[in-house]
Amino acid sequence: MENKFDHMKLENQLCFLLYASSREMTKQYKPLLDKLNITYPQYLALLLLWEHETLTVKKMGEQLYLDSGTLTPMLKRMEQQGLITRKRSEEDERSVLISLTEDGALLKEKAVDIPGTILGLSKQSGEDLKQLKSALYTLLETLHQKN
């Protein structure tokens, strides 16, 4: 028989499963990213730039679900590492454009096997992972719209 507090057990908390899974996933990335001398958030920013080459800080923040207070210091560090350049837009001086440097672009080749390596650790079928990803995107969008 369920008691009225069963829903409050840690094992029944979706947020805990998401939090713990995220931490464990990030731990799996760490040794792979250490070889490239980048952090997980930097890797996510690079994924965007490898796809788009140049983005505004605002667009990057939207895509990464990060505010400028978190994103700007990370981008400054990436610029110091020689991975990106930051430049004011000529059309709109309020807008800052982020572009890959040659070194940042070259990291793509070194990182090419990372997604497959991580997926291989999950031991999930491709279909299961596709469904999980879809459910997580739906949850993310739903929660983000509440803000």
From Swiss-Prot:
GO CC term (a single one): cytoplasm
Keyword Transcription: yes
Chain coiled-coil ranges: none
GO molecular function: DNA-binding transcription repressor activity, RNA polymerase II-specific; identical protein binding; protein homodimerization activity; RNA polymerase II transcription regulatory region sequence-specific DNA binding
Protein name: Organic hydroperoxide resistance transcriptional regulator
Regulation of its activity: Inactivated by oxidation of Cys-15 to a sulfenic acid.
Matches recorded under InterPro entries: HTH_MarR-typ, MarR/SlyA-like, Transc_reg_Sar_Rot_HTH, WH-like_DNA-bd_sf, WH_DNA-bd_sf
SMART domains per UniProt: HTH_MARR (SM00347)
Keyword line: Cytoplasm, DNA-binding, Oxidation, Repressor, Transcription, Transcription regulation
Gene (name only): ohrR
DNA-binding region residue numbers: 57-80
Modified residues (Cysteine sulfenic acid (-SOH)): 15
Annotated localization: Cytoplasm
Entry-annotated residues carrying S-cysteinyl cysteine: 15
UniProt-listed Pfam families: Staph_reg_Sar_Rot
Lineage: superkingdom: Bacteria
PTM annotation, UniProt: Cys-15 is oxidized by organic peroxides to cysteine sulfenic acid (Cys-SOH). This can react with the alpha-amido of the following residue to form the sulfenamide cross-link. Oxidation or cross-linking results in the loss of DNA-binding activity and the inactivation of repressor function. Both the cysteine sulfenic acid and the sulfenamide cross-link can react with free cysteine or bacillithiol (BSH) to form mixed disulfides. Further reduction of OhrR by free sulfhydryl compounds restores repressor activity.
One of the protein's GO biological processes: negative regulation of DNA-templated transcription
Cross-link N,N-(cysteine-1,S-diyl)phenylalanine (Cys-Phe) per UniProt, renumbered positions: 15-16
Domain HTH marR-type per the UniProt entry, residue ranges: 11-141
Main location class: cytoplasm
S-bacillithiol cysteine disulfide, modified sites: 15
Function: Organic peroxide sensor. Represses the expression of the peroxide-inducible gene ohrA by cooperative binding to two inverted repeat elements.
Subunit and partners: Homodimer.
